[in-house]
Amino acid sequence: LSLDLPDKDYEWMQLSGAWSRERYIKNRTLEQGITAIDSMRGNSSHEHNPFLALKRHNTDENAGEAIGISLVYSGNFRMQAEVDTHDVTRITAGINPEGFDWKLEPGESFQTPEAVLVYSENGLNGMSQTFQKLYAKRLARGYWRDKARPILNNNWEATYFDFTEERLVEIARKAKECGVELFVLDDGWFGARRNDRAGLGDWVANEELLPNGIKGLSERIEALGLKFGLWFEPEMVNKDSDLYRAHPDWILQTPGRNTSHGRYQYVLDFTRKEVVDHIYGMMAKLLSESKISYIKWDMNRSITECYSNKLPSDRQGEVFHRYILGVYDLYERLTNEFPEILFESCASGGGRFDPGMLYYAPQGWTSDDTDAIERLKIQYGTSMV
């Protein structure tokens, strides 16, 4: 998007923060020069949401002019306003140009992410209502778009990695007594996952913990009158996993350099179709065999060493964008095959809380901060778009 405005008499508003402090409202007055937000993390990020608003100095919740711009994209982005020597303001929004190249052969085309532009004469409330109505009816889609969402209980903060099948069933039983409708099993149910150092990428049940497998556990949960949900982190892998031992070249890594990890995990190369196909196959098999009504899709680290062994050196500038296209492809295939499963997007809380995700997952994890008072600023900022 590129938009010119004839003056600079605006306040810039952005939604910024950090983990557990996502989307705090930040305001500043536009002056000559460049005001910008961006992400180079491989996701839209906790630090800056891909949204900005320009509002007149007298604009409040219900009166005054406001212009909102929201980027429908989940990867690296940049949004900026530049005031020139004539006090003309130019707004641009799109893929972050830093580190980005895309090679086009003759006859080929490239599709850029879409941006949504909203103009309001009825203040910030008029702007936010327009965004929300548009996204609720024209961007979100599928079986769950217009349905009330189930009240859920997630075991993570009750057990972390320390659970057994019997303990999970007991938690679910008590949750049912409290009016909960959906029980969600979080991290730790798969492979050799007894802590965060192993197992990612091996999406098969740990039979020592779950002797009846996910199928058996899901049936026991449903017998209590609850629906059953499951946590995945499809884009990541631990070195201590069968997947990594079989395919050490399937991660993003720069040749000749040490590959850094976050939470002891590495990023799978989702630019490669065979990698996405493999993860899809494991997830689809499990979803087909078990009574699963909900998926929490997590992403717990940023992308570093963004280099694909599959692409030639003159196409490495495409990796970040190709990666997020791979994520979208996996979402598209799973949501098409399992249309009645409720997908919730998550990235260490609200690290990928953007309209691009909303198209595939009609529910988003707002933040890992569940303190009622601390959430007030997060909820207020989130309500803007």
What would you call each of these model-derived segments?
Residues 1-82, 98-100:
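Polysaccharide-binding surfaces and accessory modules of carbohydrate-active proteins
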